[in-house]
Amino acid sequence: MEENIEKRICVEQLAIEDLISKLPEVLLSQILSYLPTKDIVRTSVLSKRWKSVWLLIPGLDLDSSEFPHYDTFVDFMNEFLFFSREENPCLHKLKLSIQKNENDPSCVTLWTDCVARGKLQHLDVEFGGRVMEREFWEMMPLSLYICKTLLHLRLYRVLLGNFDQSVDSLPSLKSMCLEENVYSNEASLESLISSCRVLEDLTIVKIDDNVRFLRVHSQSLTSLSVGYKSYYPGEIYYYYDRDRGNSGLVIDAPRLKYLTFNNDQSKSKTISNLGSLVKVTILGPIKISRVVGCTEQQMAHKFLTGISRVRYLIVSEDMMEVISSYLKEDSLPQFGNLSYLKASVWLSSFDFLDILPKLLESCPNLKSIVLETTCIVDRTKATVERRVSSVPECLLSSLEFVEIKNRISVDDGALEVARYFVENSVNLQKVVLRLASSFLRRGNQAVLKDILELPRRSSMCQIEVFNALNGHALCFRKNKITGRVFLDYFDVAESYYGAIVS
């Protein structure tokens, strides 16, 4: 009986296998395309019918580290590309992750040349592992620059040489990501960017290379991210002087909407023709230094003026230090379109409440402000007087939302900043405070109670308090017998705590 059941199961499985195997190769390749590349290749051992089906897949993600030896990977790639060239001209997407040693052969240039001559639309080439050292990197072929079908390109730790600048590069390319590469010279990189006539999204992450001045001139670009990756000594071989003394960044892109700086180390920044700018994000350290003929203040003024038409602005602690230093000598350019500002701040409450009104005066139409603060409280008469002496235009007209996250649990400088907004904002609708539970357990409930009981200039203003660590809202409950108000909150372990605040 059991033998009959087993035979029937085998027959049913074979029938199912036969049904799948009889599907057209085009349909089979579409089904396989939803699997990881490793599993796709494994189907080649199922039967003779499946031996070459995986070679018809339009997109593959190949990692040399998943092969027992690099030579095995080389043989596999050579066979695959030969078949692709002869039988599968519809390879549209390819990612190559290369990890090799000093004795491994250099084949990536040839492979890239092969796929660039087809109908490729997405190409991602990256060198990792031991290949951090530049002598292991490989040169991209000239055929890549003239690939007519390529839409998306990512190159990570490769060498890019000169090319024919009289020919439009990559005529269909929409998105390009260049990370930690080495270029033949500055002019070559500049020409590569400007000759991509329909390029919309560009990301550049630089290292200590031979490109001192990065120039981005584009009539089509809508999104740009510029970053810098530094390595500690011993991590990578340095081939160029690490001193960025005469480094610079030039951006001229009239259609640019989104601009991101991520640890940008260029000393001078020239930004022009950015009338379409919507959002600027400044992450990590940023350098704005004096250059020949211009003081640091003048360079900062040029940079701030260049981004002054933005609607959404996110700035790091380092950028806030630049702004703070600038405000000591001059007022900021007017950010007339700015409606959303997010800033990380590390200052005493005295210093921050000194620059905050000056900062807000340059944002007459600001609607929302989010502050991640590390403000050390400084309760002095001067602080109080300064807090109420200056009321910027946006507080009297447009500001509706304030969020403050306190990153220090032992100080209540963030509450001093919150007090400024609550006392002076005419149309404020909501104030959100994100505080550490340890802050609330260290005798600061009275300070919080003062904030909650402040006379609010806006009758619509609501104040919400959250535990910054777990996002739980803090509740206020009134004892029916004593009339006292209790503050309930949860710590990281979500244990219950209660504190009397009145």
From Swiss-Prot:
Residues covered by the FBD domain: 384-435
Domain of life: Eukaryota
Keywords per UniProt: Leucine-rich repeat, Repeat
Domain (F-box) ranges: 17-63
Residue spans of the LRR repeats: 70-98, 99-127, 147-180, 181-206, 208-228, 238-263, 344-373
SUPFAM superfamilies in UniProt: F-box domain, RNI-like
CDD domains for this protein: F-box_AtFBL13-like (cd22160)
Protein name (record): Putative F-box/FBD/LRR-repeat protein At5g22610
Lineage, opening ranks: Eukaryota, Viridiplantae, Streptophyta, Embryophyta, Tracheophyta
